[in-house]
């Protein structure tokens, strides 16, 4: 029953006026304002305030207080303080409420009659974060009669509420506030976008109060069930659910054991909406057809005013309407429907203006919009729909009208709910049971499971309604037609049968008078619309669609039941709409049916149910068929036959019981009196009407009063003896249960949801905009991942569709299509011409580029002082201060280009002269790049100083480089060629001219630097600054090659606004844009604004007035690279945060850009990357590159408050109150700036407002904020600290966060140290900031226009030295700007710190980054670890001399061609993987030494697919446990064999040893990895990660094996990522076993664990006998073969070592229950376990001794490798055990066995020279020499220890490789300091064979 809002809230609405003519008095106004401030203290905007006033909530628009969501706060507070106190009586408890809110609530109640108890129970983890001091554990039960829960009901399920009542016998009422949008029931868009916005996902929705997604929170999508729930039935009692108060999305629920309101429906507020006619959009979602009435009226007026509107005109008109802010909630799908409606409406016969005949409507609308609908709508239906819609436009406001449901719980199934939108959790078996229930009337198993009926009726005794049986027979016929060859004849007979039946029913007039008749009955139509639609769409789509014309004709000729006819018309329209491809769709359906076992099972389901149902015999099955056949007849025939059949069955029944109860219909009962959900149409139960007692006073039962208000309802709850006004149980079999199990769409989408990895639909372009719009609509409704493939000819203009997130059950469905350019004509006046031509075919070479025009001479800027270019000086080491390239040339920026043979083999002609000091400047070093290329921006040619020598010519490229440059890897994409200088001001584009006019024409010209763009493109390709798809990676290769091929050179005009934080740089730029937008509305089509972050993009889009399309005009910096379609003007905000080289790449890809406008601050943070060898770290940063182009410098800020500005030493014009405070406690309501990124992300996930030092740049906090300073702050750069200090316009609070009494550690940063000393010495902070500003500002002060009048230091005492202008306009000199390399933070380096003490966690900074890790770490002992020495990066350069012979050079073809001659081409070695539709990317394809080895990448989907298919095995936990129990005997055999190898006595468990192992494990876990690695793995410390859940990925590695050189792509290595708690818990026990096994090892057994190669060499020299043969072996799929047998072996080993029993059981449980996102896994070994190498080695020993007779000789083991110094024979009893193991061994017998890559030879161990040779060649190109050279050198020296004995067991080819290696490392040691030190400590032997060989 709908309660009028005026009456419901009359008591709470305050009236401030005495009468209609007089206003309130001053006293009344002040009283009312004070009353309003209690629940609405914050300022509310005009739009939300008007909505709140409609529901009796007054607000204050001029309040000085602000809030992030003031309107929702007022709604929440009004319910909390004004309404809730009415429902709290007697003893009550309050859960989940803040302390201050509880005190406010306590002040509103009567303390004499009500007692409140506060139990701050946290419902979710987010509440624990927001409300400190909450109790995370559930309190268990409520001890009071009434319980109040604040905003928690939406997170609770009916089972949770019922359990709470069951465990709280004293509780009789639950009063709860909840925020549940009522439109979420149908997934409609937000009805009130001024108050909140919604975002729907697969299983939850995101609720953004006041549209602020920064404060948004998630809630389960199933929470909307509380909106339509009337009662909650359980096995013990029944609960009533009422909603006495509701305002927009805020509701008050009362759940009690007392009876509730006698309502059958529940209404909620809704804006004035209308529903578009169904005739236009059959089968569409209702949410997409509900549009605001005013918007539809505008379209109706438009359609009536034009002669004939096309779809293009209607689309343009719709966009013009939707641009209004009040229609912001209208989705693109709704816009599409409105456009179709307008174009079709203009061609229909309107009531007052006929335009065209009615018959033209089908041709004009259906043929044009839906080309595949080849039939016409009947005229009767058109008139009916048009009249209904016109009437609908005159109806009052549309309301959300929900029918209330009764929620049933059953005790035997844990109250599972199958019909309330829980289809995701239902298994396929449950869904098949639902199909059975729909097809054949009832399934006993389904009835037993859902309704809890333990004695269901037999299958044959439940008669089917005619509609259900008829549809079941149609399904069976459809299945036969799909399977059997003669399906055409059967389909013809089926259509004829239904046609004859329909004709008989229609022709016979007696049938038309019956309320329910045959196929056209109301009950059939209702069932078809709800439950039958699933089967109609699913199993027999073609059959049902072919019978649709019959339904049409029947609907037209049956005017007595128009509602039923309309339903049938809708069903037919749905079928025609979805299956519009006819024969093709039939072929696809048939093919999938035959290939897919799941679909085949669904199609054969009728046969299975018919022949394998629950009937005990064939007799009963045939009886069921007879029953269904009878049910298909009309009612006047079927009912007597069913009665006769029941009588016959009664006579045959021996116990005279009626097995088939027939409920005959009552002639006096109507359709409304009968239950349509019941298969037998039983009568509804009558409501019990108790007799009125004469002693009863009418007001004693307030539920019967006419005016039902909140007060009346609250009073009714106090009555405990009120009888329930409705039945408490529903005894009908709900066939509608299956309606919630499957989606409402067609079956193939349902099957994709269930079995998504078996179907992929590729839909191509049909040339119309409708196709992709319809696909986008389906993707939005089903929440599919949409991937778009764009044709090459459309790439230039296409902007892309929004990609939906959230795969279905972890699977992706790809909808690929080529777009139609529907918006090309709406882009404005300026047309950029046709798109570039497509690339040439791959078989032909690309056309040669045209000769680029000569660059015009550069004209100096039109300013007084011309900027001079500073020459980079060389330091004492011969390195440039602005680069970290050492002595590499520009072409060597890419390490993929190898040095030529001349670089390493050529002898210098003379001894190299030492470099002289830089101060003498007698000679200038070789330039880094050729003179034709630019290192960074050069404003003008710089004259060479007279005392400097001329620059030598650049090194000529080698022949290899030329060949690589002339042979592109693939055809080049369309890239710009040629180039030109920037046009003059009079030749600029009109938009660029306008910007130049605003700066008085004083723009500057900037030359695009090619090396910077090359560096950025290579970083982008390697993933150093982000990840990109494979297709884009190939395009980047083409862009990199095009630099050399096309020789692109150009220059652009620039305007650079520079200044300190808060000086209005961005505001000045946006004001210019806003001014020009007002003058020229088409300017937005030619100007693009680029920001570094999404937050800044949204902020800039909101600042511009009128607001622009944020997704089109304002972009992030990735968009111009992915979609290069910029206009003439590019505005870059916060350019300092852009990667180095980004702008040059954008200008290269977007040749139309003529002007670039920057805003940047050199004193704030710059772009950072965690990749230390990234190219962007080696070139000047973005702000350093444009230092000489500053057009305007702004130094006076208007952001910080005077108190904050004085403390920071900054000039300001602000007058806001504020100062710098210090504290140690966080305020959760303040904006927080933290140093840890994962902590900030974690807080933001749960509703906090937290930034990092880097992400806060560009933001302005208009209220107080706090900055956290802890041990991790010292790893940040001064620029980021300065940016974080200057973000706010109010109070700044410094929070010093420590975990112990010890002070925070210091660093070399003066600004950080000044922040630490601020509490004691605040004067150091302004000095540190002044020094920081002086470090970067001076280079920006030359040739700038000062934004303020020049004043000297005396007149401006607040000015910094860097800002003081000397006479003549020159600024004071300062220190040169630091390079980016010297200013990088050290967070990526390995931080070695002392061991952690439990009471002193501050000494371990890693724990501050990983908050959850602290709870897993044990006690530590004090120890000191020296700081590791990081070798200086050294790159290989030019030639250097050697004394060795040169008969075997490094690039001798005899060494290289022998390996590479027989290799396949790179493009033929990668393989195509059909499952993912991609090719592996394991071969580099560069044509150099990198092609020798395969490279596994972590982002290679194809390699991951074949890896998982080969490495993983799947099984359920129960099967794993059974396997463990069945293999105990085989496990004991392994353990017995292991004891023969290593005797293990029974011992007592050593607890002290375990503690040592725990300390060692924890210390190694934190100190062995760099801090950056721990930060990247921070998610492994999340407590929400399940202990038995692993995350799988492939290991990124290079396969450097001799047998894999030049091979085809292979499977990689799968890595399992466990939760950190699992690793830290099991690590000590693994170390314990390792220590005990080492202590018991026999002297002749060697385990290569925690040993070095020198240890292995010593063991071989002491124990190996080279006079006899040895046996070595390897296994195939060794990890996957570690099954349950080895688990039993490992448990026996633990028992022998006296492990605690609970530890052993926990280990077995973990091995049996491991699961992943692919599903539960079988028992196997995973790379990533703490046991992997240990148990692999021990299992190898056990298996070897179980299979072979092994003598007591020298033997070595390591993982799956082994080598035994003797031939071994198979044991006699092995034949009985061979079937119990899955291991496949590959034994090899010989005199020179191999072990772990080493060859055991007389005299020692030797690394294979050929493998070491190619590894060196690969590493020389791929990595820095300092990283790989020392390790390979040690392996070479260890091999050479055998001296001249190598001549005996090495071939001449191996000796040639060895000689080349010795010669190379000898030369390299002269140039690499770290290798030279290693050579002095470990020199090459004097009798090296290289010396012997060099005598020739």
Curated annotation (Swiss-Prot):
Reactions accelerated catalytically: ATP + H2O = ADP + phosphate + H(+); RNA(n) + a ribonucleoside 5'-triphosphate = RNA(n+1) + diphosphate
Residues that bind ATP: 996-1003, 1059-1066
Ranges for domain (+)RNA virus helicase C-terminal: 1195-1327
Domain Alphavirus-like MT stretches: 60-227
Domain named RdRp catalytic: residues: 1668-1774
Pfam families named in the record: RdRP_2, Viral_helicase1, Vmethyltransf
PROSITE patterns, A to Z: ALPHAVIRUS_MT, PSRV_HELICASE, RDRP_SSRNA_POS
Residues of the (+)RNA virus helicase ATP-binding domain: 1025-1194
Function: RNA replication protein replicates the viral genomic RNA. The central part of this protein possibly functions as an ATP-binding helicase and/or methyltransferase.
Protein name: RNA replication protein
